[in-house]
UniProtKB/Swiss-Prot annotation:
Keywords: Ribonucleoprotein, Ribosomal protein, RNA-binding, rRNA-binding. Belongs to the universal ribosomal protein uS5 family. PANTHER family: MITOCHONDRIAL RIBOSOMAL PROTEIN S5. This is Small ribosomal subunit protein uS5.
Length: 192
C-alpha cells in the first residue's frame, strides 16, 4: 500500500495526471437538486454545471448528475475536460472583436474592452471568462437567465470569434497589414 502511494496511486500515470489537472482552474456554476419519481416515492439526486479552463485560451463546460454532490461535481469536471475549446485572445487578455451568441431563448453580447476594464459580466458568463483567462470584457445577457442557456450562448459567441490570422487568410492579406489597419482605425477614431 505504501509503495502504491509513492508511485502516485493505483491508476497508471497518477503523478503526471495530477500535474496536468493542476494547470486547470474549475468553477462550479450551478448545482441543482433533482428528483426522480419511482414507485416507492421520490429518489433525489444532484446535477452540477462546471466550467474549466487553463486561463491561457482553453475552456470547456460539463454537466454531471449523481446521487451525491461531490460525485456530480466530479462527473461534470470530467465532462468539461473532454469538451475543451481553444479561443483566440487579443494580447492574452480580451476578445478580438465584438460578438453575439445565442442558445434557446438565451442571448449574450460580448464586447472587447481596453486594458484595466476588468470582467463586467454576470453569473455564469463571469465563470467562463475567468477560467478562459480573459481580463477585460464587457458582456450582457438578454432573455433566458437559465445558467445552462447562458453558458451555451457564451460558448456559441466565442466559437464565432475570428483571429486576425483567419481574417487575413480570408482576405488574402498579411496579418501585419490587418493589424496596421486596426491600429490606424483606432487612432482615427480617437482623433474625432
Amino acid at each position: 500500500m505504501a509503495a502504491e502511494r509513492e508511485r502516485g496511486g493505483r491508476e497508471r500515470g497518477g503523478r503526471d495526471r495530477d500535474e496536468r489537472d493542476s494547470e486547470f482552474v474549475d468553477k462550479l456554476v450551478h448545482i441543482n437538486r433533482v428528483a426522480k419519481v419511482v414507485k416507492g416515492g421520490k429518489r433525489f439526486g444532484f446535477a452540477a454545471l462546471v466550467v474549466i479552463g487553463d486561463q491561457k485560451g482553453r475552456v470547456g463546460f460539463g454537466h454531471g448528475k449523481a446521487r451525491e454532490v461531490p460525485e456530480a461535481i466530479r462527473k461534470a469536471t470530467d465532462s468539461a475536460k473532454r469538451n475543451l475549446t481553444r479561443v483566440p485572445l487579443r494580447e492574452g487578455r480580451t476578445l478580438h472583436h465584438d460578438i453575439a451568441g445565442r442558445h434557446g431563448a438565451g442571448r449574450v453580447y460580448l464586447r472587447a474592452a481596453p486594458a484595466g476594464t476588468g470582467i463586467i459580466a454576470g453569473g455564469p458568463m463571469r465563470a467562463v471568462f475567468e477560467t478562459l483567462g480573459i481580463q477585460d470584457v464587457v458582456a450582457k445577457s438578454v432573455g433566458s437567465s437559465n445558467p445552462y442557456n447562458m453558458i451555451r450562448a457564451t460558448f456559441d459567441a466565442l466559437k464565432h470569434q475570428d483571429s486576425p490570422r483567419s481574417v487575413a487568410n480570408r482576405r488574402n492579406i498579411k496579418v501585419s497589414v490587418l493589424q496596421a489597419r486596426r491600429v490606424g482605425g483606432d487612432a482615427e477614431a480617437s482623433a474625432d
